[in-house]
Structure formats: structure tokens, C-alpha cells
Amino acid sequence: MPKGQCALRMSLVVAAVAFASGAQAADRAALLGKLPPTLQALYTDPITVEPSAYGDFQLPPKPWRWCHSESYLGNPWRVTANAELKRLVGEAQKAGDVSEFLVSDSNGDTTQQISQMRSFIDRKCSVITTIAGSSTALDAVIADAYKAGIPVVTTAGAVTSPYAINVMHNQNLWGYQEAKGLFEKIGGKGSALQVEGIAGHPLVQQEDAGFDKALAETPGVKRARKVSGEWTASTTKSVVLQSLATSPGKIDVVWSTGSETRVIAEAFKQAGRPLPVIGGSLSGDALGWWHEHPGEFKFYGGEVSPHVAAQNAFRVALRLLQGQKPIINTIIAPMPTITDADFSAWFKPCMKSDSTALFPIPPENPFPEDLMNGYFTGGAATPEFDYSKVPPSCGS
């Protein structure tokens, strides 16, 4: 091909890509423009949105068969989320709205989860809620569920299928806002230890990008080191101790996004180092440690709550089954901001420093009904869900 023609073709390709990107951005802006401004603010660039596929969804008759597909029930967070969903669906069963609640667990095997979801389709479930084991591998079976008239609602992570309704936090925004809050706590000057989750995980990449953006906006804060805690207490404590052993300089803040803030504090104490401001997801053991060490635990973060994850899936699925029309396919749930000044409202006497399987109940509903209404055409609260009736962390 002559050099001039090659250059012309290349310029046309670049122009076409730019045009397509611009059109997609315009479509995205128009779609998000249908949401209230408070909800639009929850969508940053990494979040992909499409129109909901359920604008003309045909309502299944009552009583409904509710099916839940779990990808892994092997940690306390997932067990807690599953128990809360079981409680909520159980209340709907008592009211006569649900005939049966079926649960599958693929134990980390995506192929098995696909097979289990196909079984749910064969059993003519009215709705499938899921914590997906893959963002892409379930797309075909989700499309098959849609063709069978079965809506699929994901929580605690999204899938790429346009036939699902995803309910999730914006991990990119969470990582950014937490970092900004931590940096403000130290006056915009100091040293930050970054403790990410599982390196390379899609959610971790989004969280890290949020941290990087906040760091770039705060030139007075320098990154001391970046380590991977893998969202587990033992690994997190080990890598923090290693960092402290090889980084003699002062650490002013620790940014993390998991529920391992208590072991981070313990690592600093073990190393004989002053406690920094620690960020992450609040947990029962962290609140227990705070109560046992008054005045020492400085915190800025939020809570990725298993209770709320289950509640959000239940509420969105219930609205679908009752005829409310989602505007978009990815619903962003707000993340509550929590500091150590708020701990007294979150702490319960049952919380000890070893309460690793205990997750605090937010004092107030972090996703109020009027806010959720903005995601639906004809949005209205469902009487089947009453946040005031959520059991307390320490039981009745």
C-alpha cells in the first residue's frame, strides 16, 4: 500500500474510533442524565452503564420461587450475606409472596456456578440473585435466564451482561474518597502505606486507580510503599510488618479497602511504631479493638457491609418482581463515610478484638428508599423491606 494511502487509512481509523468513543460518551451522559443529580455523582469513568433490559418485563405470578447463586460461601462475609438474604426471603415466604428459596454454592468453580444457574432456569425460578464468580463467564447463562423470563440481579460485584441488573458500590470512587479523607486528616502532608487487596483483581484495580488519583491531587503526600494484603488478616499483617521493618520513616496514614484494619493497627503496635490514621472497611473486630484501646485507633473509611449487600439485592429484585422498571443496568449504592468519631454509634458490647466473623449493622439505612427510587421508573418503597427490623449485631 502506498505510504500516503496508509497514512490516510490510519487517520480514518483514528477518526472512527474517536467518533465512536464520543458517541458512547454522549449516550452514557444522556442515560445518566435520567437519574437525579445525587445519583449521577456516584458514576465515575470506569463504571460502564447501559439501558436496563427490563423495560417491558412480564411479571411472574405469585408466589415466587426465589433462587440464589453463590460463587463461594467459604468466608464469614459471604456466610453473613447469605444468612441475611435468607432472613429477608423468609419474611416474604411468611407473607405468602415466595413459595421456595433455593441456594447453590459453586465453591469458587465458575463452571459449576454456570451449571447451577442453568438448573435454576430449568426449575423455572422467578428471579435469580447472585454473587458472581466472574464478571464475564456467566454472561451466556444470564442471557438464557433473560430469554426464559427470569431476571438476574447481582450484588457485591458486577457482570458484563446487559441482561443483568448489577447492584454495587463504585470501588473507584470508594478508593478515591477514602484516600482524600485520609490525606485531609493529616493536613495534606505525610507518608502513606498502600495496602491493596488481591493484586490484579478488577475491583482492586478500580480502588487503586482511585488512590492514585487522590495521591496525584495531593503533592504533599508521598507513597511509602504498596503491598498486597489479599483481603486476608494473616497476609495483611505479615506484609505490613515487613514494610515497617524495611521502612524506618514515619507512616502517617494506611490506605486499605478490606476488613483488616484491626490487624494493621496490631502490626504497628507489635513493631513499636506510632499508630497512623488507618482506612478501610469497618468490621466488628476493629470496633472491639478500638473499645479495648481507647484513644488510640484513628480511622477514616466506610463499610462494605454483607448485610447491606444482601438487602440491596433483595430490594432491587423485589422491585423488579413488583413491576418497577430500572432505568439503567448498573445501580451504584452509596458508601457510608465513617470516622473514629462515629464508632460509638456502631459499637455493640458483643464486639471484641477477635470478632472477625461479626459485621456491624449501620445505624441508619445507607441506601434510603427515596434514593433507590431514583433508579426506577415508578420507583416506590416496598413494604416487604423495613430497615428498622434488621436484627442487631449482637442478636435480640
Regions found by a protein language model. Name each.
Residues 50-52, 97-124, 226-247, 263:
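Structural motif
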Residues 91-106, 191-194, 212-234:
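Short beta-strand elements in bilobed, periplasmic/extracellular small-molecule ligand-binding domains
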Residues 135-173, 191, 285-295:
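Flexible loop/hinge segments that line or gate small-molecule binding clefts
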